[in-house]
Design a protein with these regions (language model features):
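Glycine-rich, proline-tolerant flexible connector loops at the mouths of alpha/beta enzymes
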Residues: 1-27, 119-130
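Conserved beta-strand positions in the central sheet of alpha/beta enzyme cores
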Residues: 5, 30, 51-53, 77-78, ...
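Short beta-strand/loop segments at the ligand-binding rim of alpha/beta enzyme cores
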Residues: 24-30, 47-51, 144-158
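Short glycine-enriched loops at secondary-structure junctions
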Residues: 33-37, 58
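Short, acidic/turn-prone active-site loops that include or flank metal/cofactor-
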Residues: 55-58, 81-82
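Alpha-helical scaffolding within the catalytic cores
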Residues: 59-65
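Catalytic alpha/beta core domains of metabolic enzymes, predominantly
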Residues: 64, 71-194
Length: 194
């Protein structure tokens, strides 16, 4: 649930969205905001254990989001990004994941509540990005026992034709390497069957 397009009124809209969503579905929400005040307001009305999207090593974001999740039972997406930008290699992703996972665990976030997003980058920009992502998923699941992995899948096909076919095939490849969760279009029946 993201209300970031409502600049200046994000908190109000985020609360409204969560209230309305939870009237029709009986599952927790993934709340997406870099604003800790908006997150805290949304969490006050959220029913059940929410997921926060996301924390990263970007200095301002890490410092803002960590107090919201520290010592709680919230699920948290740990985005492999730092103040230096997006990592391109598996090694760079692992370094960031290591700092994020260890920092969260040291602040009493259960390891099973951490969902590392190694960041999918478009293969139309660099054809090695897909391999680097897949290797990162496998390495993260091996190195950090109990941690989950997830991603925003459609980034892989950005700028390319027939995106849905690329997305579906890449999803299967990523799941085979250990990916636990995908941010996808749930109305794509073929994707849901992949």
């Amino acid at each position: 649930v993201n209300a970031g397009t409502f600049v200046g009124t994000e908190t109000k809209h985020l609360k409204w969205m969560i209230e309305n969503i939870q009237q029709v579905v009986d599952i927790p929400c993934c709340i997406d905001s870099p604003d800790p005040k908006a997150l805290e307001a949304a969490l006050q009305i959220h029913k059940g254990t929410a997921m926060i999207n996301s924390i990263s090593l970007e200095e301002d974001r890490y410092d803002a989001v960590l107090p919201v999740v520290a010592g709680t039972d919230l699920k948290i997406v740990a985005l492999c990004m730092s103040s230096e930008g997006m990592p391109e290699t598996c090694e760079q992703r692992l370094k960031i994941a290591d700092k994020l996972v260890n920092g969260l665990v040291k602040n009493n976030v259960p390891i099973d509540n951490i969902y590392v997003d190694p960041l999918v980058q478009p293969i139309g920009t660099d054809d090695t990005y897909g391999f680097e992502f897949l290797d990162s998923v496998a390495a993260i699941t091996t190195q950090f026992k109990g941690v989950h992995t997830m991603c925003g899948l459609s980034n892989i096909s950005f700028g390319l034709p027939e995106r849905k076919y690329i997305n579906r095939n890449f999803a299967v490849m990523a799941i085979a390497r250990g990916l636990d969760g995908l941010i996808i279009n749930p109305l794509d029946r073929d994707m849901m069957g992949s």
